[in-house]
Amino acid sequence: MINEIRKDADSRMEKSVEAFKNQISKIRTGRASPSILDGIMVEYYGASTPLRQLASVTVEDSRTLKINVFDRSISAAVEKAIMSSDLGLNPSSAGSDIRVPLPALTEERRKDLIKIVRNEAEQGRVAVRNVRRDANDKVKALLKDKEISEDEDRRSQDDVQKLTDAYIKLLDAALADKEKELMEF
């Protein structure tokens, strides 16, 4: 029973770290990358649809993304969705394509992005700690029902704490890498 709780906590903590890494991969650095636009949702016939389903996004050069919209009638909606995102991008239409120039990151914008990344990291840490709390609560319930001894309870809590520390270290390492990447000129 305790092993199942530990395995569940391990997999949930791993998912939290992966979600954090996925989230920060969308935060742009100085280079153009189609993944920057992954989180963009476009209003399409009354439904919020991911941009990836409505258009192909390619890198035109190191500072420009090119979006080829499959249905030209929604080009304006795609532009609006990109402008209203918190990425600070200004797309421009060029026939059937939309070009998204990526402005050079100013020192101020880099610092803003680092704040955003740190906030995401804190949310990741909170998610990992919530998993720890859930696991410890399940173990406490087993102790209360007298299914395990106090020694097993203590040992299990120590194991879950070690897992928590390991996953928070992974989060912090990913945070440090992203901060370093953002500060490169």
Swiss-Prot record:
A single GO CC term for this protein reads: cytosol
The record's annotation in SUPFAM superfamilies points to: Ribosome recycling factor, RRF (SSF55194)
Q: Which GO terms describe its molecular function?
A: ribosomal large subunit binding
Compartment(s): Cytoplasm
Query: What are the protein's UniProt keywords?
Result: Cytoplasm, Protein biosynthesis
Q: Name one GO biological process term.
A: cytoplasmic translational termination
The UniProt entry lists the main location of this chain as cytoplasm
- State the InterPro entries in the record: Ribosome_recyc_fac (IPR002661), Ribosome_recyc_fac_dom (IPR023584), RRF_sf (IPR036191)
- Superkingdom as given in the UniProt entry: Bacteria
UniProt similarity note: Belongs to the RRF family.
Q: HAMAP family of this UniProt entry?
A: RRF (MF_00040)
Question: Which NCBIfam families does the record match to this protein?
Answer: frr
Q: What is this protein called?
A: Ribosome-recycling factor
